[in-house]
Amino acid sequence: MLALIQRVKEARVEVATVVVGAIEQGLLVFLGIEREDTHADADRLLKRVLAYRVFADAEDKMNLSVQDMNGGVLVVSQFTLAATTDKGLRPGFSSAKAPEEAKVLYQYFLDSACANYHKVAAGEFGADMQVSLINDGPVTFLLRS
């Protein structure tokens, strides 16, 4: 399981021109689910996402997590993160979990996030989404479960 996290000043996701999720300062989390991923992977990755220190403290060092600074978390499913890109000129998606199974694991991750943190918003799994954000930094990290 992969989480591409971006520190943002704000972010929102729309489906068919309707805003389905939005946050102010916090983390935008693009979540990629691979074929072998399990609930345990989701638990491990969520713990890291919520505790990963990417926000500046009083000394301007990255010492604060999204929880420490009471920021928002916007979770967006993105199967393209699981793509194989090492050969050729077209991505392959055989390493991504099948959509039906991925949706269940995505929902588990999202439900766990909501149960463990109070400022969680989300996109819509499998939808054609438009994601708008203002990067802060930019600061972007790829986390693996």
Q: Where do the model's predicted regions map?
A:
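Short Lys/Arg-rich amphipathic alpha-helical segments
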Residues: 2-119, 136, 140-142
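Short, surface-exposed recognition loops or helix-turn segments adjacent to catalytic cores
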Residues: 62, 119-130
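C-terminal or internal capping secondary-structure element at the end of a domain, subdomain, or sheet
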Residues: 125-145
